[in-house]
Amino acid sequence: AAEPLKADRELVLEAVRRSGFALLFASRPLKADREMVMAAVRWNGKALQYAAEPLKADRELALEAVRQSGCALLFASGPLKADREMVMAAVCQNGEALQFAAEPLKADRELVREAVGQNGKALQYAAEPLKADREMVLEAVCQNGEALQYAAE
């Protein structure tokens, strides 16, 4: 579309409500428009990647994104990857989102249990002591037998 059309707020809002990834084609000012980005991440959390940098640090926006797609945690700002509630919401939606969490949270027993309960293969992203924990490994292999490969030696 021509640049003026990609800057047409009403038109772009209509587009992102139908496909969050349409945010990729929006004008720079619209990628910084909170309502626009919220509409996009409600459709697909991973659309957060196309938001202006300051909005990737917006807790409410990022939380909406990870609730829709756990792996959208990848696109959230660094401090949000260390936010326990944020990471818990992400791993509840997709256990493999654990890979994008701040290192200290990969050692959080409750959080890792939630992640491996959702997807056993998330065990590969857990801190080493949890990979050696029988109870944690059992939880992971009950969800996916192949998770055994990620248990500590």
Task: Put a short name on every predicted segment.
Residues 1-153:
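Thr-biased low-complexity repeat/linker tracts and other Thr-enriched repetitive architectures
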